[in-house]
């Protein structure tokens, strides 16, 4: 008996010892099973290549207060895991250390580095207290420094670190131009969009109305939501910039829609003939889609006025993306605001190649001619019979000048291999119309694509987002509704009958044996 007890204690001690050793090993080694569809928690090839190409040592100082409550306590481990991965691929050129800012001197050091304290609520002995904590990262490279003051959003952690490393190790930023002079949207006034793009690029306004050439050091040019007609002098500068190998994004509103007036009017931008020369066009129509966002409207009933949410087909929530293009392949959804269809049927005849980036859903349609925009309008199946209307596209190849054989004569009549992006909505990136993170990522990915920075696209597009719900028919909705009402009682009754029959059978079996 005593021997058996000793053996049991020895086995328990051995198991505990093995568990302790495994725990120590798991802390020192980074190894995670990533079951997310987009491998959100796995370091991307772009990040691996970036740190693998470092030519000098980068030092990272992680200022993290220990013993913080949930959910902040998981942030430290997440940062530790990902820094271990970066270090493994950096070929000895990346080192990190964790610092717990304690006392006045420790906090002063963190704040001098640009790490601001955050207020964290802590429950201590049934009392709610506020504790100062630090959750920041400092990166040092040669005589340069980048700071991530607060790390809270773990889903974008890799992008935050990799983009900071890119800024830290890149000597000069590429210039991205955005046109002015025709009522275009001012990207510097779009707070979120400006922050997302300006962190990696030098954003430069350029007034096309002056008729001056687009500077050659502008890597890509954005034409965002112009309101007035382009004269030939402005079109000439766009054309010649493209002929010199420049890249352009045309983000255009072909219909000026006013929800308050419930009407819309076509907009003549004067760009249609030039875009057709480039194999594409934005049609003067509005795309409606069953897969759409809700809007708030005022309704009257019984003498009362109240606000309600109604689905509005002219704000499509697009999720039909080109799975082979890095701009959109990892996005979940984009909210468009009065979007027009894009036509690229003329590209093939000009020797150009196209890729449709975004399409409408399987149940969509278009409004043309006289535009009536009524949130309460009922649509027939025929109104929503189109499948996959193109909403954004790329045209690439060697373009022919729109001004060849015209006045003023083209200095350059054909371009080297280059590309343009065309989107039938010029508002999707504005602060008022950002439906979700997908809109911002879409615009930033377009800029990266035109500026030849595909690496950041793949990192940024990784996110833990919920895809839009699949649309179901009214008949399926009714079936699910009644199944939800009737199904549970039927299951309970069936289970009761099953138990009752088992008891009866068991009782009969006992009586038979007796």
Question: Over which residues does each language-model region extend?
Answer:
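Extracellular ligand-binding/catalytic regions of CAZymes and related secreted enzymes
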Residues: 2-59, 163, 167-173, 281, ...
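Juxtamembrane extramembrane loops of integral membrane proteins
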Residues: 6-228, 232-239, 253, 258
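A general marker of short, structured functional hotspots
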Residues: 82, 237, 308-310, 478, ...
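Low-complexity, flexible helical/coil segments
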Residues: 94-100, 131-136, 211-214, 256-261, ...
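Extended, charge-rich low-complexity interaction segments
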Residues: 121-144, 312-327, 484-485, 492
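Amphipathic alpha-helical surface "interface" segments used
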Residues: 178-186, 293-303, 463-478
């Amino acid at each position: 008996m005593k021997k058996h007890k000793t053996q049991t204690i020895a086995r328990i001690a051995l198991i505990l010892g093995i568990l302790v050793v495994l725990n120590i090993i798991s802390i020192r080694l980074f190894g995670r099973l990533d079951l997310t569809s987009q491998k959100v928690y796995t370091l991307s090839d772009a990040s691996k290549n970036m740190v693998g190409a470092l030519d000098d040592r980068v030092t990272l100082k992680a200022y993290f207060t220990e013993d913080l409550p949930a959910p902040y306590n998981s942030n430290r481990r997440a940062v530790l895991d990902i820094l271990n991965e970066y270090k493994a691929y950096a070929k000895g050129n990346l080192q990190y250390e964790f610092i717990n800012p304690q006392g006045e001197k420790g906090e002063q050091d963190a704040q001098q580095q640009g790490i601001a304290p955050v207020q964290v609520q802590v429950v201590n002995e049934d009392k709610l207290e506020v504790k100062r904590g630090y959750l920041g990262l400092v990166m040092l490279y040669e005589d340069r420094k980048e700071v991530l003051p607060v790390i809270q959003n773990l889903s974008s952690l890799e992008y935050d670190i990799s983009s900071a490393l890119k800024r830290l190790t890149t000597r000069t930023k590429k210039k991205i131009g955005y046109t002015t002079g025709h009522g275009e949207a001012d990207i510097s006034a779009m707070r979120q969009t400006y922050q997302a793009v300006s962190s990696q690029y030098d954003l430069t306004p350029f007034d096309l109305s002056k008729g001056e050439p687009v500077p050659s050091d502008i890597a890509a040019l954005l034409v965002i939501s112009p309101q007035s007609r382009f004269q030939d002098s402005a079109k000439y500068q766009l054309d010649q910039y493209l002929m010199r190998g420049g890249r352009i994004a045309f983000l255009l509103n072909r219909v000026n829609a006013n929800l308050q007036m419930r009407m819309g009017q076509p907009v003549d931008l004067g760009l249609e003939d030039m875009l057709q020369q480039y194999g594409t066009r934005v049609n003067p129509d509005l795309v409606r889609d069953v897969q759409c966002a809700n809007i708030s409207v005022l309704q009257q009933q019984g003498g009362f006025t109240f606000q309600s949410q109604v689905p509005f087909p002219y704000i499509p929530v697009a999720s039909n993306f080109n799975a082979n293009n890095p701009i959109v392949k990892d996005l979940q959804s984009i909210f468009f605001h009065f979007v027009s269809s894009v036509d690229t049927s003329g590209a093939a005849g000009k020797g150009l190649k196209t890729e449709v980036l975004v399409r409408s859903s399987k149940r969509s349609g278009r409004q043309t001619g006289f535009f009536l925009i009524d949130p309460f309008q009922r649509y027939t199946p025929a109104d929503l019979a189109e499948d996959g209307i193109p909403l954004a596209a790329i045209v690439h190849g060697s373009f022919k000048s729109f001004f060849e054989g015209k006045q003023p004569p083209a200095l350059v009549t054909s371009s080297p291999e280059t590309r343009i992006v065309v989107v039938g909505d010029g508002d999707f990136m504005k602060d008022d119309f950002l439906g979700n993170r997908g809109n911002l990522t879409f615009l930033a990915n377009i800029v990266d694509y035109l500026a030849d920075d595909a690496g950041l696209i793949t990192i940024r597009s990784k996110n833990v987002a919920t895809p839009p719900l699949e649309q179901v028919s009214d008949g399926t909705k009714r079936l699910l509704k009644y199944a939800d009402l009737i199904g549970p009682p039927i299951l309970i009754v069936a289970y009761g009958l099953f138990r009752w029959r088992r008891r009866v059978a068991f009782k009969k079996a006992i009586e038979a044996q007796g």
